[in-house]
Structures are given as structure tokens and as C-alpha cells.
Amino acid sequence: MSYSITNSSLSELEYKKYARHLVLDNIGDSGQKRLKAAKILFIGAGGLAASAILYLAASGVNCLGVADDDKVDYSNLHRQILYNNKDVGKLKVGIVYDRIKMINPECNVNVYSSLVDEYNCEYIIKNYDIVIDTTDNFQSRYIISKSCYLQHKVHIYGAVRGFEGHISVFNYRSGPIYSDLYPQSLNLDVKECNMFGVLGVTTGIIGIFQAVEAMKVILGIGNILSGYLLVYNLLDASFKKFKILPKNNINVAHYHFNNQFAYCNIISEQDLSLIRSKYKIILIDVRQPEEFIKHHLLKAINIPLKNIRSRKNMYFMRDFLIDKIIIVYCYDNLRSLIASQILYKHRISHYLLNY
């Protein structure tokens, strides 16, 4: 992706504001002009967007779009640092507009006070280079992914739950797209942010990572998180990278976004009951230990996703469970699907429970 800097010039004030950028070898004058020329759209103005918007505006990005139809609620304030008590009941995008202008008065800010859906997504994103996806549901992510794919836009994905966050960059230089990680055919469903807990600072961290990836793409520096999912666990202060296996022979005209998932056999809870009655099985719960202790399926064992690639666990599953049917699961399929791809890569036969 290239950014035309022929028409971009830095004012005297901008040279003062971005002085610490300009002395960096990988940025300098031309890099700052690229940031100024970039056009970034945020879909969602919640916790992830809050930190990313602030830093990108402060970094000198001169065109930012924000799409969200939501209003500020008291329950937002612990993680959505763009807002305060006085903003409760107001449209988020109006407040975001004012905050960006306070930080970067020269920034061209476009706000869309509507829900992004299959009918308006392509229209909204067409004038931007990068789409930062801060939504909290699968339906919106699939719509964003498809629109970015068809219009050749970089899709920067982030998600949080509890003390854990995920981030990846999709559709970058013919790299994987969101459906390669979570195929639509699985009919995945996950509770939205207002239905489960999340530590506020987790959203800030992942949002900043999204901003970092956007800046790396714009500047053409570093290793972009394309083809990998980065998983950050706040409690362990750990980072894990998981490779995303892309579909083969993709082209714009014929790619189907509801591709069947070929990595493993997916079973329902009803199928599980039938298999249990006929075969020896081993249920592997890939959630964190504290989640497993609170609730788990009968006779399940716990191998957290972050540990599933260890030599010890691979040896255990490949050699000690050879006479058993391996079934992996988690609460919402997010982590079990990643675990399934890892097992597939290591040629370990298994089933994925659509729980």
C-alpha cells in the first residue's frame, strides 16, 4: 500500500508537534507525510476504538472516520476513555468528533451515526485505506471482512474478553481474511460486551495494538500481523502468536465467505451424547484454568490454549490418547477453533464441539 505524499506538506506547527517522530530513522519527514495522507475508518467507537483514535489523531493522521449508532452509557465509562459522566446519553460519534478536533484541529473527521450493515458498509469504507474493526459481534465482522476484501482495504481486527485480547491484520497483500480464522459456516455466536465481563485496561491495550499495526502499514515498517493471530493474556503478561491458515486459490469473483470448514469434524452437543455412548472419548477444555474451575463439561480435562502447542501436551495427545476420540471445546468456540487449527497442523485427529 502506498500513500501519495507529493501533495502533503508539513506546517511549522506540525514540525514542532511531531518532532519526536521526525528524528526516527523509519519515519522522518516522508513518514510523517504518509501519516498525514492516510485515511483510516473506525467501525465502532467503544473501548478498543477509544485508545486507538486518541493515538492516531495525536500521531498526525489527517483523515479519520468513525461509524457507530450507539449512545454513551454509564457501563461504558470504565473502558471507553473518550467519554465521561457528562456524555452519558449522547451519541458517541459526536463526542468523538470533538475529541479528535481538540487533539488534531487539522484532521478531517467524518462521522456516521448509523449501524454498519451489509447495505451501507461498502459505501462507507470506499474512501478509506484502512478499516479498524472494533465491533463486538461476528455478524458485523463478517460484513466488514467481505467489504474490505472486495474493495482491497486493510482490515485490522481486535477483540477482547475478560483478561484476554486478540488482534490480527486481514486482507493485507493477499494475506488471510477474517473468514479464514472463523469460517462463517460454523454459525458462531458470542455474547456482546454488555453481557460478559471485561477489564477496562484490556480494551485499551488491544486498541493501541490496532493503532500500532495501522501505523506500520502506513509507514511500511516492521512485521505486519498478517497471517497470525496475536493473543495477549493480561493475567500472565503473555503473548502468543498463532498462524492463520489461508484458503487456497482465492479470487474476488468466486470466493464464498461461507466456506465449509475443512480442518476438522464439527459436532453438536447431541452428537457428543451419541459418541459418548459408543466410544472412549477425551474432552479437552482450552479455556483458562480459572474459567475451567468455575464450570466445565463432565470428565473434561483442561489444556489452556496458550499451552496446547507444548511438546508435553502434543506428546500426550498424539501418543497417550491414540485409543480415544479427542474433542476440543470452549465456551464460545473462539479459542477451541484456534486450538483445532493447531491440532490439524500437527496431524492430530480430533473433533470440534460447537458448544
UniProtKB/Swiss-Prot annotation:
Which domain of life does the UniProt lineage start with? Eukaryota
Compartment list: Plastid, Chloroplast
Q: What is its EC number?
A: 2.7.7.80
Q: In which pathway does it act?
A: Cofactor biosynthesis; molybdopterin biosynthesis
Q: Which SUPFAM superfamilies match?
A: Activating enzymes of the ubiquitin-like proteins (SSF69572)
Chemical reaction(s) catalysed: [molybdopterin-synthase sulfur-carrier protein]-C-terminal Gly-Gly + ATP + H(+) = [molybdopterin-synthase sulfur-carrier protein]-C-terminal Gly-Gly-AMP + diphosphate
Query: What family does the entry list?
Result: Belongs to the HesA/MoeB/ThiF family.
Q: Which BP terms in the Gene Ontology apply to this protein?
A: Mo-molybdopterin cofactor biosynthetic process
Q: Where, in this chain's numbering, is ATP bound?
A: 47, 68, 75-79, 92, 136-137
* PROSITE patterns given in the database record: RHODANESE_3
Keywords from UniProt, A to Z, are: ATP-binding, Chloroplast, Molybdenum cofactor biosynthesis, Nucleotide-binding, Nucleotidyltransferase, Plastid, Transferase
Domain Rhodanese span(s) in chain numbering: 277-355
Q: What is this protein called?
A: Probable molybdopterin-synthase adenylyltransferase
The Gene Ontology CC terms held by the record are: chloroplast; cytosol
* Subcellular location, principal: plastid
Q: Identify the enzyme class.
A: transferase
Which Pfam families does UniProt cross-reference here? Rhodanese, ThiF
Which Gene Ontology terms cover its molecular function? ATP binding; molybdopterin-synthase adenylyltransferase activity; sulfotransferase activity; thiosulfate-cyanide sulfurtransferase activity; ubiquitin-like modifier activating enzyme activity
The UniProt function text for this chain reads:
Catalyzes the adenylation by ATP of the carboxyl group of the C-terminal glycine of sulfur carrier protein moaD.
Q: Which CDD domains match?
A: RHOD, ThiF_MoeB_HesA_family
